[in-house]
Regions:
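Cell-envelope/glycan interface and biosynthesis
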Residues: 1-138
Length: 139
């Protein structure tokens, strides 16, 4: 996703919250629960993508946590590590990632890393912290 696309998505979500009666400050804060500011999205790296199935979209559904009830999403979570992907913003890890649970957001980290992270139930921040500790001990 380009920076311009991220800006459009971010501004649209802020506008939706403003229309619901939130102040600008509140609307921006609520938007940041699920979207990063333009220029700060993992999508800009080419390593992250949002995956939802066609029936979900055709039913007029948005990117929402309830997507995790879909068989297609459950299959992705079960097999993602075989292809080097992780579920980037996992349920229960919101305080660590700073982003709400997103069952549609996947990030490529490589097969070996993905398998390790899945086995140990780590999000990227925790994995990086482990690597940094390992590297500091080897100095």
């Amino acid at each position: 996703r380009t920076v311009d696309r991220q800006r459009t998505n971010f501004n649209r979500r802020v506008d939706e919250y403003l229309a619901e009666g939130y102040s600008e400050e509140e609307a921006i804060a609520k938007t940041k629960e699920y979207l990063t500011e333009p220029g700060h999205s993992e999508h800009h790296t080419g390593l992250a993508l949002d995956i939802v199935d066609e029936p979900w979209i055709n039913a007029g559904r948005r990117l929402e946590p309830e997507y995790d009830t879909q068989a297609s999403q459950q299959w992705l979570v079960e097999t993602m590590d075989d292809y080097g992907f992780i579920l980037r913003y996992a349920k229960g890890k919101e305080e660590i990632t700073g982003i709400q649970y997103e069952p549609w957001h996947f990030r490529y980290v490589g097969v070996e890393n993905a398998r390790f992270m899945k086995e140990h139930e780590l999000v990227l921040e925790e994995f990086i912290e482990l690597l940094e500790k390992r590297d500091s001990l080897s100095r």
